[in-house]
Structure formats: structure tokens, C-alpha cells
UniProtKB/Swiss-Prot annotation:
Topology Intravirion: residue spans: 41-82
Sections of the chain in a coiled coil: none
Organism of origin: Porcine respiratory coronavirus (strain RM4) (PRCoV)
Family of this protein: Belongs to the alphacoronaviruses E protein family.
Virion surface-side positions: 1-19
Protein name: Envelope small membrane protein
InterPro entries: E_protein_aCoV, E_protein_CoV
Length: 82
């Protein structure tokens, strides 16, 4: 069975359609790559936001607690004998 000659614009044995499909495939791969890069950027932004909002303030609070609870070491020269 052959394709009707009236509908054939260029007899290139499917080369034009093949090229169109390859271009579509390349465009889809590029779009997926861009989407993947944007997802990775979003993950990095979320990690930085979590560090800024949660980890750094908790670390400052813990440092303040450590400084507040620090007890000076016993110094025998400074002790008062009663």
C-alpha cells in the first residue's frame, strides 16, 4: 500500500516528519531540564529559609542560655575564709 501521490508534498521518505519529531523531543528535553533546575533552586531556597528562620535563632538562644548558665570555676585565692 502506497501513500496517495496527491497528498505528497515532498517525497523525502518521512525525513521532514522525523526532523519535526526530533525537534519536539529536543524541546521537551530542554523544558524538562529547565524544570528540574528550577526544582533544585527551590529546594536550595527552602533550605536557606529554614536555616534563617529556625536554625539560626535557636542557635542564638542556645548560646545565650549557655552564657547565662556558665558558672565561674572555683578560685582558691579569691575564696573568703570565715
Amino acid at each position: 500500500m502506497t501513500f496517495p501521490r496527491a497528498l505528497t508534498v515532498i517525497d523525502d521518505n518521512g525525513m521532514v516528519i522525523s526532523i519535526i519529531f526530533w525537534f519536539l523531543l529536543i524541546i521537551i528535553l530542554i523544558l524538562l531540564s529547565i524544570a528540574l533546575l528550577n526544582i533544585i533552586k527551590l529546594c536550595m531556597v527552602c533550605c536557606n529559609l529554614g536555616r534563617t528562620v529556625i536554625i539560626v535563632p535557636v542557635q542564638h538562644a542556645y548560646d545565650a542560655y549557655k552564657n547565662f548558665m556558665r558558672i565561674k570555676a572555683y578560685n582558691p585565692d579569691g575564696a573568703l575564709l570565715v
